[in-house]
Amino acid sequence: MFTLKKPLLLLFFLGTINLSLCEQERNAEEERRDEPDERNAEVEKRFLPIVGKLLSGLLGK
């Protein structure tokens, strides 16, 4: 039983470090995107394809 605890503990420890690094990277990206122009561009990127699909669906019928 003790032989299983060591690898599991190691995996847990490495996974925790990995998640911590991912959170730091994500927070850094969010800080970079805090500029209003970039935020508006990102909203437009999400919104325009949806509108395009709706219009093509309506005009195609």
From Swiss-Prot:
Signal peptide residue numbers: 1-22
Superkingdom assignment: Eukaryota
Tissues expressing this chain: Expressed by the skin glands.
Record carries keyword Secreted: yes
Locations listed in the record: Secreted
Keywords of this entry: Amidation, Amphibian defense peptide, Antimicrobial, Cleavage on pair of basic residues, Secreted, Signal
GO terms under biological process: defense response
This protein's GO CC annotations: extracellular region
Main location: secreted
Pfam families in alphabetical order: FSAP_sig_propep
Maturation propeptide residues: 23-44
Modified residues (Leucine amide): 59
Role this protein plays: Antimicrobial peptide.
Protein family per UniProt: Belongs to the frog skin active peptide (FSAP) family. Temporin subfamily.
Protein's name in the database: Temporin-MT3
